[in-house]
Amino acid sequence: PAGDVLLLFVIAGLVLFFTRNWGDGAILAAAVVFLLQPVEWYHCIAGLLNPAHRLPDLGVGEMYARVAEYTKAGNFGDFILGNVTLGQKASLLWAVNAGRFVQTAGLFLLGFYIGRKQLFVATEKNLRFWVKTLIVSAIAFAPLYTLRELVMDNGAVVGQTAGTALDMWQKLAFTLVLVASFILLYQRRKFSAAVAGLRFYGRMSLTNYLSQSVIGAFVYFPFGLYLAPRCGYTASLLVGILVFLLQVRFCKWWLGRHKQGPLEYIWHKWTWIGTDK
C-alpha cells in the first residue's frame, strides 16, 4: 500500500531527457550499463574485499512498519496522508535498495532504443531479430535463475547485491521471452484478433493503472470492503479478471468518443504546457 511506482518512473525518466539527443549506440551502451547493476556489483566486490562492509541502511523496514500501522487502522484520511508522504518515501527508497531504480532507468533507455530502431514494426528483418531474442532469452533464463538461487544463499552482502543483479537479469530474460513471443504470435491472424481489445486498454494505461489501484484499495483495505482476509488466490484472481474486463469495456466506450483517456489527456497537456500541442 505504500507510495506509488509513478514517482519512481518520474525520477528515473529524467534519464530520457538527458539522453534525448544521444546517438543510438550511446543510448544502447547506457542502457546496458544501467542494466548491469553497477551499484550492486560495487557493494558485492566491496563486501568480498572487506568483510566489515555493510550496505546502506535506508530505514525501509521501519517505514513500512509504520505504513502497515496506519493502513490496518482503517482511517481513510490517515491512509491518504500517509501514502502521499511516508508511503512515497518508503516506496522510492525500497526501489533504490532493491536495484529497481537503476533497472528502471536501464529499461527506459532500452525502450527508447527499441522505439528509435522501430523494432516493433513487423518487417522481415525485425521478426528475425525477435526470433533470435526469444531463443537467446529462453536459453539464458534457466542458468540465470539457477545462479541467482545459488548466490542468494552465499552470505548476506553477496546475496543482497550479486543476488539482486542476477534476479534483475533473470527477470529481464523472462520479460524478453514474453515480449518476443507476443510479437511473433501477433503475426498470426487468430491471435491478433483474440487480443485486439488490448490496444484500447493500452491506450489508456495510466487511467487503467490508477483506477485499478483505487478499486483494489476499496475492495481489500480496511477503510473499504476489507476483503483481504477473506479472499484467497482464486477469489483474488477472479476479482482481477472482472475488473480487467470492465476496464476493457470502459476503454472501448471512452475511446469511441475521445482521442485519449482522461488521465492521458491531462498528462499530454501538462507535458506540452506552454505549447500548442
Which residues does each predicted region cover?
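Solvent-exposed interhelical
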Residues: 15-30, 113-135
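Kinked, hydrophobic transmembrane alpha-helices enriched for aromatic residues
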Residues: 139-148, 200-227
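Functional transmembrane helices that form membrane-embedded active or gating regions
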Residues: 131-134, 186-216, 259-271
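Alpha-helical transmembrane segments and terminal signal-anchor/GPI-anchor hydrophobic tails
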Residues: 132-186
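C-terminal "closing" transmembrane helix and its immediate cytosolic amphipathic cap
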Residues: 231-277
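Long hydrophobic alpha-helical segments that form multi-pass transmembrane helix bundles
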Residues: 32-110
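Internal alpha-helical transmembrane segments
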Residues: 1-43, 216
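Specific transmembrane alpha-helix
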Residues: 6-19, 99-122, 170-189
